[in-house]
Amino acid sequence: MTPCGPEGSRVAPLPPRPEELLLVAFGAVPGALLRWLLQADPLANLLGCLVIGIVSGSEPPRPRAMLLVGIGFCGSLTTFSGWILALETAMGRGSLSGVALLLLELAAGVLAVVLGRGLAGRLARSRPRLRR
């Protein structure tokens, strides 16, 4: 993982600077507050997947938006640790329906990222092009 996205992403990594740390921090606070207000990890995770799909699918790539929204906001909104805890709890109880529900949530998250990237592409195509 690079500071701006997964390996091979279109977002070039930036050298860490105080400005970038502040972008991540400023994005993290509203993300964490929204997660707390929602009180629903699956909804928070799906919303975060949709948003990071939009940000990562933007053209041209926007490294600062990825720091603020992708890493800061979505990173604190979503919860991999909570998802794994729910999975382990369901498995410990022998709840196949609980495990199936969590796997469904995982698939929905992937679809939300794909949808977000598609929305970003549509938004990019609908913007008027500047002539040089």
Label every model-predicted segment:
Residues 1-132:
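Membrane-interface helix-loop junctions in multi-pass transporters/channels
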